[in-house]
Design a protein with these regions (language model features):
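Short, charged/polar "capping" segments at the starts of alpha-helices
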Residues: 1-6
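C-terminal functional extensions of proteins
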Residues: 7-97
Length: 97
């Protein structure tokens, strides 16, 4: 995990593994740049009916042209604040794609 990312252990502790298959992205970068992810992750990402992305790092790095992605994050820096038109500290729910 990078910065404050959740781990597979965190997902299991929260019970997510009882609801769905949990897989790592394979990327060590902050966020989820698909070019750094495993083939399995990218295939599952592309096949998913719904993608909900959590965190500003994913908002910044998850580039999925032609793919609808719902982003949930808190604005933590002036650059993103300007990009989304919201003050720092704002909680955002945005759809891209």
């Amino acid at each position: 995990p990078v910065i404050n990312d959740a781990t597979l252990s965190d997902a299991a502790q929260a019970g997510l593994d009882r609801l769905c298959r949990v897989i790592p992205s394979g990327s060590e970068a902050p966020g989820t740049p698909l070019s750094s992810c495993t083939e399995e992750f990218v295939e599952r990402f592309k096949a998913a009916d719904l993608v909900i992305s959590k965190g500003q790092g994913n908002f910044e790095t998850l580039d999925a042209p032609g793919r609808e992605v719902f982003h949930l994050f808190m604005v933590k820096c002036p650059v993103i604040s300007q990009e989304v038109g919201a003050p720092m500290g704002s909680f955002m729910a945005m759809k891209r794609g």
